[in-house]
Regions:
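Conserved catalytic cores of phosphodiester-cleaving nucleases, focusing on short active-site segments
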Residues: 20, 39-60, 65, 77
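Short acidic/glycine-enriched loop/turn segments that link adjacent beta-strands
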Residues: 35-37
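Catalytic cores of nucleic-acid endonucleases
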Residues: 56-105
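Short, solvent-exposed loop/turn elements at beta->coil junctions and helix N-caps
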Residues: 30-33, 102-103
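Acidic-basic catalytic patches of nuclease active cores, encompassing PD-(D/E)XK
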Residues: 1-30
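Hydrophobic "anchor" residues on beta-strands that sit immediately upstream
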Residues: 26, 49, 94
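Domain-level recognition of nuclease-like catalytic cores that cleave nucleotide substrates
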Residues: 87-129
Length: 129
């Protein structure tokens, strides 16, 4: 992965984290990695554990950022989330899967557009977008 792409991803995650914090989420983990996959952010909203996939793009030329959360990626996140819940003794906790789409485009590049998609997919990995 090129350095510009890594930079875009890191900026997207920073913007997503700031957005979530400003909207009452409490960040528990960042870049949680398991043999089953990685989860960008794990947060609490109230008493719900929220697993967040962050997607960032420099433009909408190839579609909105959330369109790149494939079924395969969703399944990886669900598996990694299950492992997290098990490891943390939270197997009975309410949880959901959100996507934060961040677009750095044109004059707004310094102030990206952030879109939160709550309940973006379920444990079966079925996208709603």
């Amino acid at each position: 992965m090129g350095s510009a792409r890594l930079r875009l991803g890191a900026e997207g995650e920073r913007a997503a984290k700031a957005f979530l914090l400003a909207n009452g989420y409490r960040i528990l983990r960042e870049n949680y990695s398991t043999p089953l996959g990685e989860i960008d952010l794990i947060a609490l909203e109230g008493d719900v554990v929220v697993f967040v996939e962050v997607k960032a793009r420099a433009s909408r030329e190839f579609g909105p950022p959330q369109s790149s959360v494939t079924l395969t990626k969703q399944r990886q996140i669900v598996k990694a989330a299950g492992l997290y819940l098990q490891r943390e003794g939270l197997a009975e906790a309410a949880c959901r899967f959100d996507v934060v789409a961040v677009t750095f485009e044109g004059e707004r590049a310094e102030r990206p557009q952030v879109l939160l998609i709550r309940d973006a997919f379920g444990t079966g990995g079925t996208a709603i977008f």
